[in-house]
């Protein structure tokens, strides 16, 4: 019994604890009507609710802490796999690119017209190695960057949830926490600022300043002007043409891609205009094209749909003269997007101003209707509703600038007409007020002067009478209906006439306004698009003129010791073209005005440094020295016009010393001429000139193994002056002649076997004209062109002339079983012979830049001689 009682007490205690009983109420447990105290239960529920909220609040704080902190190390496995990609969002003006199998960082940079260093900076790469399948951010060619932001310097978001979600969670937690908790724990009241991953560090900024990337134009000599990018680094200067340029698409990028080491640059000068007479006469550069290109493309990207929005916005802003000042055209065009919150106040004020204008500028008929309404003392509710509906119709017929407003106004008019004609109680109310209106009209006709003199008083009485009629209509509606039936049973005809009068008046005004609106809107719609296009073109032209005024171009002249190398050809071809253009030591570029100072600072700061000539001298001299205008005299290389047009010039140390020596030498020579002093150098130079003139005929007269039947002695001497240096001193050996070997190309190839020297081809045609070619290698059968830049063409028709390699291409010599050809390009050969060595043809070509060698384009071969040098 004792154990059973203890068991019951234990179970009872559990139930009591579970149900929230007070232990003091155990004695009264058998009573069924007794209920636990509600205060204890409410307290327990509140504690349970607070516990649950605290758990949720701590959970949300933990989530926010994990989302806004990237240094705690509590990242998930997925975040670790793609942690670097999640560390920043895609910068503005970039697009994603997946690395392919054969891609490298240099090839990707070349494909998207950028530099490898910029790709490293955009993607936060630790090395230049890329793997297939890797995602990279590359510049978007269709993106138009603004002045405020650029793709490389766009801010990067931290590794955190979206800002809207974070703010929502923070505000929710703050509202749920008690005020004491907020004040006592500031760590939880506000979210800790997260560590934002910056887009560029100080080291990267310093690194990016070590090169200049300038959009400019390369002005060539006789090959046009192309747009491209000039890349200036401390070690090299490189120009890459734009692939979208018309000349590049026509002739290829091989013609315009150039590069040279910085140590080869002897002088870099900036000019206001081109001082080279050849380039100045043949090339005209559009100085405003680069400066206004971005603004022009930005205006051109406005779609026709946006034109409609812009015009409507300009309409609203122009009509709202009472509330806002009119904006200029350029300012209205610069605001591409208007939010609804910005436009809604303008539209509301516009409607209010329209209502004011309507009240002030109503017609005579509307004034008469208003005068009649002022004299009405007792009017029904339906009549007042109809009058308000008609006023709404008039308001809705105000100009809105589009067709949808007209259609809506017509629909509102039809609805208002239907509301006038509908309702069972309308006829009763009209019949009730018809007599009052008739009396008012008669009183108006008889008391016109009184009404006009007491206009202000009647206006005040009008408001009072309308309010009284409104209250009286609600209170005594039934009484008025019975009175109308008893007293005015014969007034239905007058009410019908009044209704027709009101309807005709309203319809006439609505029709008049609708016709005016349709006519005006049609004109606006027909002239909107041409006007908008003309407006944009005008704005663009004004912008272009303004940019030309403030952003004129400057011309950069680079003088080098060796010709620049082609970058889009093989190394062997580049070396050969560099040899062919060995006389071209000057290159011109049209750069924007604001980049002139950048180039000047770059050459001074980041130019390669050269050691001094003295071995023991530890000090270094800068790579370039600034040349001042007062250091130049008449004996310098620059003329007076050159000095006037030049803004600044930096020269290498070697060039600076050379100019100083030349200046000193010229001053010394001037002094000697003034004092009539003859130096030893002048005497030796005069004697050497006399000796050279005496020995010149003998030195250029080679020994021939056989007498030539085609060349005279003076012609041989002229040809000898243009032969390659490795042929001088060797006798001329006749290896083939049509008089000895016959006229056969196969025989000619057979006689060339075993030779390893240049050969001279001399042709005489049926017109007795002498011309030919010097081949750097013996003639042979080949699948493609062969030879070197030593090859040239010559003619004695009518005078002696030599055409050497221009460097445009390497189509020197081509031999097969049926023909022998020299030069090429454009589908024509400079010199062509058939397999029988009987027919020939000569034409201009790009390889040698020659004219037609013979008197006629097609000729007949009379005799051929081939001489070797061995």
From Swiss-Prot:
The record ties this protein, via Pfam families, to: LysM (PF01476), TLD (PF07534)
Q: Where is the composition biased (Basic and acidic residues)?
A: 61-85, 167-177, 345-360, 454-464, 473-484
Matching InterPro entries: LysM_dom, LysM_dom_sf, TLDc_dom
Question: Mind telling me which CDD domains this protein's record contains?
Answer: LysM (cd00118)
Q: Which GO terms describe its cellular component?
A: mitochondrion
Compartments, record wording: Mitochondrion
Residue ranges crossing the lipid bilayer per the database entry: none
> Which protein are we looking at?
Oxidation resistance protein 1
Protein's organism: Xenopus tropicalis
Its taxonomic path starts at: Eukaryota, Metazoa, Chordata, Craniata, Vertebrata
Give the gene that encodes this protein: oxr1
């Amino acid at each position: 019994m004792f154990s059973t009682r203890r068991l019951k007490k234990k179970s009872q205690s559990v139930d009591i604890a579970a149900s929230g009983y007070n232990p003091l109420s155990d004695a009264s447990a058998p009573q069924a009507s007794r209920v636990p105290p509600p205060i204890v239960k409410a307290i327990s529920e509140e504690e349970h609710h607070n516990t649950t909220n605290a758990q949720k609040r701590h959970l949300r704080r933990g989530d926010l802490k994990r989302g806004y902190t990237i240094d705690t190390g509590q990242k998930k496995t997925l975040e670790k796999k793609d942690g670097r990609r999640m560390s920043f969002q895609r910068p503005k003006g970039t697009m994603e690119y997946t690395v392919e199998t054969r891609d490298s960082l240099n090839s990707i940079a070349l494909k998207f017209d950028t530099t490898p260093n910029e790709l490293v900076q955009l993607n936060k790469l630790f090395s230049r190695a890329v793997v297939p399948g890797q995602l990279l951010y590359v510049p978007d060619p269709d993106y138009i960057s603004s002045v405020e932001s650029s793709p490389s310097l766009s801010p990067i978001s931290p590794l955190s949830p979206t800002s809207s979600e974070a703010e929502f969670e923070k505000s929710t937690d703050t509202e749920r926490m008690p005020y004491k908790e907020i004040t006592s724990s500031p760590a939880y009241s506000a979210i800790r600022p997260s560590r934002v991953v910056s887009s560029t560090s100080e080291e990267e900024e310093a690194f990016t300043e070590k090169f200049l990337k300038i959009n400019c134009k390369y002005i060539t000599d006789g090959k046009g002007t192309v747009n491209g990018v000039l890349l200036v680094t401390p070690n090299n200067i490189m120009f890459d043409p734009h692939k979208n340029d018309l000349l590049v698409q026509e002739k290829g990028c091989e013609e315009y891609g150039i590069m040279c080491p910085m140590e080869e640059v002897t002088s870099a000068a900036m000019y206001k205009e081109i001082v080279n007479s050849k380039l100045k006469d043949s090339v005209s550069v559009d100085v405003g094209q680069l400066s206004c290109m971005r603004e022009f493309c930005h205006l051109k990207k406005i779609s026709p749909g946006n034109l409609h929005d812009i015009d409507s916005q300009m309409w609203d802003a122009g009509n709202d003269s009472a509330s806002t000042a009119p904006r200029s055209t350029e300012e209205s065009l610069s605001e591409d997007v208007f939010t609804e919150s910005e436009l809604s106040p303008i539209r509301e004020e516009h409607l209010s101003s329209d209502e004011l204008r309507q009240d002030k500028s109503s017609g005579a008929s509307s004034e008469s209707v208003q005068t009649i309404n002022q004299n009405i003392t007792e009017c029904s509710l339906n009549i007042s509703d109809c009058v308000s509906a008609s006023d709404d119709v008039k308001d809705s017929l105000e100009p809105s600038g589009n067709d949808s407003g007209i259609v809506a106004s017509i629909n509102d008019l039809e609805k208002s007409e239907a509301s006038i004609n509908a309702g069972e109680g309308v006829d009763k109310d009209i019949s009730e007020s018809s007599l009052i209106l008739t009396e008012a009209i008669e009183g108006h006709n008889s008391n016109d002067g009184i009404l006009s003199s007491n206009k202000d008083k009647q206006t005040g009485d009008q408001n009072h009478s309308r309010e009284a009629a409104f209250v009286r209509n609600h209170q005594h509606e039934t009484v008025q209906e019975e009175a109308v039936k008893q007293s005015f049973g014969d007034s239905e005809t007058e009410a019908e006439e009044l209704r027709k009068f009101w309807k005709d008046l309203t319809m006439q005004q609505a029709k008049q306004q609708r016709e005016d609106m349709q006519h005006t809107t049609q004109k606006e719609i027909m002239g909107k698009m041409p006007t908008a296009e003309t407006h944009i073109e005008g704005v663009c032209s004004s912008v272009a003129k303004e940019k030309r005024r403030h952003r004129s171009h400057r011309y950069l002249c680079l003088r080098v010791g060796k010709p620049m190398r082609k970058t889009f050809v093989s190394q062997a071809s580049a070396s050969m073209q560099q040899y062919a253009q060995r006389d071209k030591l000057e290159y011109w570029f049209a750069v924007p005005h604001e980049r002139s100072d950048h180039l000047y600072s770059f050459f001074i700061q980041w130019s390669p440094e050269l050691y001094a000539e003295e071995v023991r001298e530890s000090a270094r001299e800068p790579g370039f020295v600034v040349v001042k205008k007062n250091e130049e005299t008449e004996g310098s290389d620059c003329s007076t016009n050159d000095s006037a047009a030049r803004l600044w010039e930096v020269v290498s140390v070697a060039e600076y010393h050379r100019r100083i020596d030349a200046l000193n030498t010229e001053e010394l020579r001037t002094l000697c001429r003034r004092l009539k002093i003859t130096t030893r150098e002048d005497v030796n130079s005069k004697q050497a000139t006399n000796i050279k003139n005496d020995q010149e005929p003998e030195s250029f007269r080679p020994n021939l193994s056989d007498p030539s039947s085609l060349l005279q002695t003076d012609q041989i001497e002229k040809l000898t002056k243009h032969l390659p240096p490795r042929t001088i001193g060797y006798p001329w050996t006749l290896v083939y002649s049509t008089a000895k070997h016959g006229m056969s190309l196969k025989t000619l190839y057979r006689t060339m076997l075993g030779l390893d020297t240049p050969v001279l081809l001399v042709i005489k045609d049926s017109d007795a004209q002498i011309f030919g070619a010097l081949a750097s290698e013996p003639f042979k059968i080949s699948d493609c062109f062969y030879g070197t830049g030593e090859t040239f063409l010559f003619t004695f028709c009518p005078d002696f002339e030599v055409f050497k390699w221009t460097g445009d291409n390497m189509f020197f010599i081509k031999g097969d079983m049926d023909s022998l050809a020299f030069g090429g390009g454009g589908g024509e050969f400079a010199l062509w012979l058939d397999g029988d060595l009987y027919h020939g043809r000569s034409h201009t070509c790009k390889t040698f830049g020659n004219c037609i060698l013979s008197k006629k384009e097609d000729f007949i071969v009379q005799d051929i001689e081939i001489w070797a040098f061995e």
